[in-house]
């Protein structure tokens, strides 16, 4: 598949031919990366695949859930309007874990998505459809959302590039909320340059999103500098949770960064067990509130019932999958009057501590290098308990808790030929430094789709 940078140079007729080619490839593919009918939001625009939790006017929006079957988006999300302004089109919807709650894209009502590198392996999640499509040659580029690693982890598992912007850098207006203080939309692309182009297209202040940062749209692509030398922190203490292939790739990446002239310094952070605990208290609490709106009354699936109480219970019981129900129950529990102080307030204090630790590291560092996941992409069905799945997020969730930007890129392959990804984490609104460092690493490795 051509890159986004190459597509920017094409005439409308050539783009139309590419869209026809994509439709054909998707119809023949077994990856299940796309869901529903492929609609084109802008004739003559560059096709960008959009995750199924972002509103595209006139297209069905399901968030991978039965409860939203048949719901058609009545408006465009801000990121879609920004794509249109840059001559890009929302072209198709990508499969995802139900309401973005998962790390494998197995919980979707549309069925699981396969990893294009090895179909017996998960593509990651929750933006697994976006990453699978980009890595599998079914999309030029895609949009995903990242609440605790949902852009970066599937990008790492499939072997493409995923950027989670700083919280507030990209408008969330039109994104179906999972955990509002953590969610962020970002690009999944074939290389770092494309990530910069798509990030520039969707970033900028939006008055319709109260958490949107009052900053001008970025111009990171024009300012990209792979020769910029930076101070990069490494966190050896956190590697004990990682498998051998990840540890080996991490230290090999450190050597490459040093050889490129970057300064490496060792730092330490709070034990990742606290990251996990705080994250799953906060995100489930927010989810239980956000998902209360899906009641069978206003939109989506409506069960047959004799009274209002029965309607609520039956619609939500039939419409939500097991993982979503689990997280709603957990969230309702931690917000209950007897446990609010013990769990929710304590988790907020840990979140503040994590942010302070990153602030301390960034006093004398430009970037932090970290694994994206403790293992390469696992096989389908290899995770036997929800806790095992949650522990797969140990390296990504702290970045969301602190609201920082981070980019995942492939740095090599395991002995089994599976992609290994690392992430560069930056200061708040420091996407330029993150992209510069990632481009330096990408060119040194020579590893891009």
UniProtKB/Swiss-Prot annotation:
One of its GO terms (molecular function) is glutaminyl-tRNA synthase (glutamine-hydrolyzing) activity. Keywords: ATP-binding, Ligase, Nucleotide-binding, Protein biosynthesis. Residues 103-128 are annotated as: Disordered. GO terms for biological process: translation. SUPFAM superfamilies: Amidase signature (AS) enzymes. Its EC number is 6.3.5.7. Residues 119-128 have a biased composition (Low complexity). Gene3D superfamilies: Amidase signature (AS) domain (3.90.1300.10). It is an enzyme of class 6 (ligase). The active site is at residues 51, 126, 150. It catalyses: L-glutamyl-tRNA(Gln) + L-glutamine + ATP + H2O = L-glutaminyl-tRNA(Gln) + L-glutamate + ADP + phosphate + H(+). Pfam families: Amidase. InterPro entries: Amidase, Amidase_CS, Amidase_dom, AS_sf, GatA. One of its GO terms (cellular component) is glutamyl-tRNA(Gln) amidotransferase complex. Heterotrimer of A, B and C subunits. Belongs to the amidase family. GatA subfamily. Allows the formation of correctly charged Gln-tRNA(Gln) through the transamidation of misacylated Glu-tRNA(Gln) in organisms which lack glutaminyl-tRNA synthetase. The reaction takes place in the presence of glutamine and ATP through an activated gamma-phospho-Glu-tRNA(Gln). This is Glutamyl-tRNA(Gln) amidotransferase subunit A. It comes from Wolinella succinogenes (strain ATCC 29543 / DSM 1740 / CCUG 13145 / JCM 31913 / LMG 7466 / NCTC 11488 / FDC 602W). The gene is gatA.
């Amino acid at each position: 598949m051509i890159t986004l940078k190459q597509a920017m140079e094409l005439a409308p007729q050539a783009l139309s031919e590419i869209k026809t080619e994509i439709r054909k490839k998707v119809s023949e593919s077994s990856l299940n990366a796309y869901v529903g009918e492929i609609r084109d939001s802008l004739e003559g625009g560059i096709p960008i695949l959009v995750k199924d939790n972002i509103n595209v006017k006139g297209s069905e929006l399901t968030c991978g859930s039965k409860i939203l079957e048949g719901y058609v988006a009545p408006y465009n999300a801000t990121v879609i309007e920004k794509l249109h302004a840059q001559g890009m089109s929302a072209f198709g919807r990508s499969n995802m874990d139900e309401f973005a709650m998962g790390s494998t894209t197995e919980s979707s009502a549309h069925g699981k998505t396969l990893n294009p590198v090895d179909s017996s392996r998960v593509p990651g999640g929750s933006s697994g459809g976006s990453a699978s499509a980009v890595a599998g040659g079914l999309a030029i580029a895609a949009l995903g959302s990242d609440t605790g690693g949902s852009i970066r982890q599937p990008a790492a598992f499939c072997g493409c590039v995923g950027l989670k912007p700083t919280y507030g850098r990209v408008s969330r207006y039109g994104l179906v909320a999972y955990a509002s203080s953590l969610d962020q939309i970002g690009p999944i692309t074939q290389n770092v340059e494309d990530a910069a182009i798509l990030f520039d297209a969707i970033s900028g202040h939006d008055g319709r999103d109260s958490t949107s940062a009052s900053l001008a749209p970025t111009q990171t692509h024009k300012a990209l500098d792979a020769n910029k030398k930076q101070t990069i922190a490494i966190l050896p203490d956190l590697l004990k949770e990682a498998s051998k292939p990840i540890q080996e790739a991490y230290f090999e990446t450190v050597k490459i960064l040093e050889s490129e002239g970057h300064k490496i310094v060792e730092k330490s952070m709070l034990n990742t067990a606290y990251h996990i605990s705080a994250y799953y208290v906060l995100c489930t609490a927010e989810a239980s509130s956000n998902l209360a709106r899906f009641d069978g009354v206003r939109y989506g699936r409506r069960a047959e019932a004799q009274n209002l109480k029965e309607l609520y219970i039956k619609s939500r019981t039939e419409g939500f999958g097991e993982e979503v129900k689990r997280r709603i129950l957990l969230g309702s529990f931690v917000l209950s009057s007897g446990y609010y102080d013990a769990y929710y307030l304590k988790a907020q204090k840990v979140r503040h501590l994590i942010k302070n630790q990153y602030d301390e590291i960034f006093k004398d560092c430009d970037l932090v290098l970290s694994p994206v996941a403790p293992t390469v992409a696992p096989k389908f069905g290899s995770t036997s308990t929800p806790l095992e799945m949650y522990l797969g997020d140990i390296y990504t969730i702290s970045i969301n808790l602190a609201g920082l930007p981070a980019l995942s890129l492939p740095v090599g392959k395991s002995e089994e030929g599976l992609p290994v990804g690392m992430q560069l984490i930056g200061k708040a609104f420091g996407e330029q430094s993150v992209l510069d460092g990632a481009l330096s690493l990408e060119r040194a490795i020579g590893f891009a789709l």
